[in-house]
Regions:
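Terminal, low-structured helical/coil segments at or just beyond the last alpha-helical repeat
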Residues: 278, 315-363
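Structured segments of extracytoplasmic/periplasmic soluble domains
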Residues: 1-5, 9, 49-52, 304-307, ...
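TPR/TPR-like alpha-solenoid helical repeat scaffolds
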Residues: 243-256, 312-328
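C-terminal substrate/ligand-recognition segments
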Residues: 289-294, 330
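Acidic, proline/glycine-rich low-complexity intrinsically disordered segments
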Residues: 1-237, 318, 361
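Eukaryotic low-complexity, mixed-charge intrinsically disordered interaction/regulatory segments enriched
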Residues: 294, 298-317
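Alpha-helical adaptor scaffolds
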Residues: 108-116, 140, 144-151, 174-181, ...
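TPR/TPR-like (Sel1-like) alpha-helical repeat modules
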Residues: 227, 231-240, 302-309, 338-339
Length: 363
């Protein structure tokens, strides 16, 4: 899942080889080389090498572990559908754990399967704790644990694990972004803003921190700042036409109109992209929720529920769904996912800036 780094355990196991087959060993190393580049194209190359390593040595646990990580990353990022990703991820992780019960990465990936694909929170925590016991210095493992904890509304613990991932891999912006997101989901907007602002300075080419600031400002009444950050984020994403049009709509019609314009344009982009490949249903659901089109939002959320889309982990956390929280269908989804119903992601007194009802009509 997400960024992949070589840990102490992995260095030891690579040096140990775990196979007497020189060809399998070299193929595995090539797979790790491409996996660490962390782009979809390179990850696809890594899969080919891991599969070739397994062909050369069917009992090579490390190669199965690498293959499981590939499917986890591609499924989590939406490069391939959950239907394709999760069974393959689980099968590879189970085989790795069978071949080497003390391979920490195998337990981490089994935890990720339980978390993302099965919504089995108890098993996920059991497996992630076992992984940390075997290798306490893997940033990816602490990130995965933080994801589980934030899903459970255990925000203090989630932040502890997120910051541990940062300590272990301080150069990765991914862990810093995750820490900011935990603050945001906990409605700790000041802390989230500080984190995102730091990222705009340390990693200026990333769109995510600007979009994170947009989300914060749009919910705290800082309209001009929100538009500016959204424009920057869209530009970095390559949506130049939308980015250029946004300030004009804001100047002529105000913030609500500009925000609605951006959401509708995003829906057009998503619809076009879905004709070419897989797009997560959550992407549609969040935009329709922002438009206050509840029926369409729940239609896409039901599809996401059926697929076990990764974004469903944020269902009871994401402020984008605040328009839906009073609807019985929302609480029913939370119940069916076995999420903690006694907790509420919405803190009393938080002012939210949403669309006016008369602007919420959809085509």
């Amino acid at each position: 899942m997400l960024r992949l780094k070589i840990t102490n355990e992995q260095r030891q196991r690579i040096s140990k080889k775990y196979t007497d087959n020189a060809e399998a060993y070299q193929l595995y190393l090539k797979g790790r080389h491409y996996q660490l580049k962390d782009t979809p194209e390179d990850l696809r190359k890594s899969r080919q090498y891991f599969e070739q390593a397994i062909d050369a040595d069917p009992n090579y646990a490390l190669a199965y572990g690498g293959l499981s990580e590939y499917y986890g990353f591609m499924g989590y990022s939406g490069e391939i559908s959950p239907k394709e990703a999760w069974p393959a991820m689980e099968a590879a992780a189970l085989r790795a754990a069978q071949l080497d019960p003390e391979l920490a990465a195998a337990h981490r990936e089994l935890a990720a399967v339980s978390l993302i694909a099965k919504w089995d929170w108890v098993t996920a925590e059991k497996e992630i704790k076992r992984s940390i016991e075997l290798d306490p210095n893997d940033a990816e493992t602490h990130f995965t644990y933080s994801m589980l904890l934030r899903t459970m509304h255990r925000f203090d613990e989630a932040l502890r694990e997120a910051k541990r991932a940062e300590e272990l891999d301080p150069l990765s912006p991914g862990w810093k972004s995750h820490t900011a997101l935990v603050h945001y989901y906990a409605r700790q907007f000041d802390a989230a803003e500080e984190r995102y602002r730091q990222l705009t300075h340390s990693d200026p080419d990333l769109p995510g921190p600007h979009l994170g600031l947009y989300n914060i400002y749009s919910r705290t009444g800082k309209e001009s700042e929100a538009v500016a950050e959204l424009q920057k984020g869209l530009t970095l994403q390559g949506a130049d036409e939308l980015a250029a049009a946004l300030p004009r709509v804001y100047a002529s019609s105000g913030f609500h109109a500009a925000r609605e314009f951006a959401v509708r344009e995003q829906l057009k982009i998503l619809t076009d992209a879905s004709r070419q490949g897989y797009i997560s249903p959550v992407a549609f659901a969040t935009n329709y929720a922002l438009l206050n089109d509840k029926d369409k939002a729940f239609k896409w959320l039901e599809k996401a529920f059926e697929e076990h889309t990764p974004g469903m982990l944020d269902l009871d956390l994401d402020p984008d769904y605040d328009n839906l929280r009073s609807d019985p269908r929302f609480r029913d989804l939370v119940r069916r996912m076995n999420l903690p119903q006694e907790a509420s992601a919405v803190s009393p007194g938080v002012q939210l800036v949403e669309f006016e009802p008369d602007r919420a009509k959809t085509d």
